[in-house]
Amino acid sequence: MLKRIIWILFLLGLTWGCELFAHDGTVNISGSFRRNTCVLAQDSKQINVQLGDVSLTRFSHGNYGPEKSFIINLQDCGTDVSTVDVTFSGTPDGVQSEMLSIESGTDAASGLAIAILDDAKILIPLNQASKDYSLHSGKVPLTFYAQLRPVNSDVQSGKVNASATFVLHYD
């Protein structure tokens, strides 16, 4: 009998302990689920763009370097979405914040930044969405360009390296 009373008191103690926790806040979780967006193709998960060797004299009158294309390949696109835009982000240049800064170093070029252009060769400012690209079923290549541009009149030769990430936004 004593064991039964102890057991009941033990269970009551557990119940009372649970009531000691206070309700301090609420977490509301929401979102949306879309079927049939696109899959980023394996060859587009890491893209390397070679700008090549560009003569320093090319920039002497504010001219730009040549555009070098790169492609983001989407595949298995379904019919639930019709467009995609792309936002590129990275370290902005200190003078022209809409362009990528060149990584610093003892042998790095200076006075230049890297512009990212859409398929019509129009500048896409960093951290801003590109124009909308139409999607269709199957594989969809999205063409972009990287281009060296002077940001001041004191352009110095050297290595040019920069990194950017991109995010796809579907509609």
Curated annotation (Swiss-Prot):
Coiled-coil regions listed in the entry: none
Gene Ontology BP annotations: cell adhesion involved in single-species biofilm formation
The protein's role, per its UniProt record: Part of the elfADCG-ycbUVF fimbrial operon, which promotes adhesion of bacteria to different abiotic surfaces.
Protein name: Uncharacterized fimbrial-like protein YcbV
Miscellaneous note of the record: The operon is cryptic under classical laboratory conditions, but is functional when constitutively expressed.
Signal peptide residues on this chain, from the entry's feature table: 1-17
GO cellular component term of the entry, any: pilus
Upregulation: Expression is negatively regulated by H-NS and subjected to cAMP receptor protein (CRP)-mediated catabolite repression.
Keyword Signal annotated: yes
Keywords (A to Z) from UniProt: Signal
